[in-house]
Amino acid sequence: MNKAPHETRVVVGMSGGVDSSVAALLLKEQGYDVIGIFMKNWDDTDENGVCTATEDYEDVVRVCNQIGIPYYAVNFEKQYWDKVFTYFLNEYKAGRTPNPDVMCNKEIKFKAFLEHAMSIGADYVATGHYARVEFRDGEYKMLRGADPNKDQTYFLNQLGQAQLSKVMFPIGHLQKADVRRIAKEAGLATAGKKDSTGICFIGERDFKEFLSHYLPAQPGVMKTLDGEVKGRHDGVMYYTIGQRHGLGIGGSGEPWFVVGKDVRENVLYVAQGFENEYLYSTSLKAVDVNWVSDRKPEAPFRCTAKFRYRQPDIGVMVHPLADGKAEVVFDAPARAVTPGQAVVFYNGDECLGGGTIDEVFRNGEKLWYVG
């Protein structure tokens, strides 16, 4: 960074939450030329769900006025629908369980929003993500957020050098409790606002009910892998691998879990027991693999990986393949590894990149996850 802070324009993506509020506050206190932008990515008149976009924007206005920075809203609804929501629906139709937050970061926050910010003279964009960027050895490294319970690098695995060179994560070095404390001490309107846990920009709705607006129910049978019918389901797209709630299978003994889907035959496969062998896999194939360094490793390498957010890292051997693919072999069998979710690679605190889980195997045999 060659310019002095007061000559450096940073455009902050503000959601109306405490994290992005404190990110903007810290940048302002450090002397940057800060602008707050609220991204409107969802048309809340589309269906009858509850959308909090209006009150979130009001919170952004309040916080920006308190901090003393200009603000406005930008509409990315079309890009969100085309790049994120359409992908989300198509993946569910195919029987997979997508991660829209990964796609939202890739296509909206660090593409459409980044491009908009650059068009208004920004030097950098900033967000309230719990992640860190360091420049060393001639390249940008993405590191886990200092708060292990809040680290969000899992969702940022598709970022590369072009984005990281233009991104600041002002709260990445802080614990969540410190962020709340800073907001409270500054009297920010969002200091006590609870964190959102819903899908990126869709909010806190009943998921199955929400999905049914776009993917109508397709009832079918629920079977064991031996072919015994255990009940009926509303549509395989409403269920995910490892799910136990909402199956409606009674009886004694351990609970039942979803272990597979056959989309063509509209069959949901279930098995009994927390440790059922069909819940476990030993390797996967990933597609759309991104390397943060922008360089595909030339040889297989050892690292750790996550197959879902907040999961402890497990040791793996990664075999990079052509066409953005990779084979990942686990040190120990892993439970409920799910096609459509992200697999993300780490070397200590450094996030190396990640991809989308495409196929899952147990001892070389492809599991019954998608027909």
Swiss-Prot record:
Alphabetical keyword list: ATP-binding, Cytoplasm, Disulfide bond, Nucleotide-binding, RNA-binding, Transferase, tRNA processing, tRNA-binding
Principal location: cytoplasm
Location of region: Interaction with tRNA: 150-152, 308-309
Gene Ontology CC: one annotated term: cytoplasm
Region (Interaction with target base in tRNA): 99-101
Residues with site note (Interaction with tRNA): H129, Q341
GO biological process: tRNA wobble position uridine thiolation
InterPro entries membership: MnmA-like, MnmA-like_C, MnmA-like_central, MnmA-like_central_sf, Rossmann-like_a/b/a_fold
Amino acids binding ATP: G13, M14, S15, G16, G17, V18, D19, S20, M39, G128
GO MF term list: ATP binding; tRNA binding; tRNA-uridine 2-sulfurtransferase activity
Catalyzed reaction equations: S-sulfanyl-L-cysteinyl-[protein] + uridine(34) in tRNA + AH2 + ATP = 2-thiouridine(34) in tRNA + L-cysteinyl-[protein] + A + AMP + diphosphate + H(+)
EC number(s) recorded for this UniProt protein: 2.8.1.13
Cellular location(s): Cytoplasm
Class of the enzyme per the UniProt entry, highest EC level: transferase
Lineage: superkingdom: Bacteria
Disulfide bond positions: C104-C200
Active-site residues, as the UniProt record annotates them: C104, C200
Pfam families reported for this sequence: tRNA_Me_trans (PF03054), tRNA_Me_trans_C (PF20258), tRNA_Me_trans_M (PF20259)
Role: Catalyzes the 2-thiolation of uridine at the wobble position (U34) of tRNA, leading to the formation of s(2)U34.
Family indicated by similarity: Belongs to the MnmA/TRMU family.
Protein's name according to its UniProt entry: tRNA-specific 2-thiouridylase MnmA
Species of the source: Geobacillus thermodenitrificans (strain NG80-2)
Lineage: Bacteria, Bacillati, Bacillota, Bacilli, Bacillales
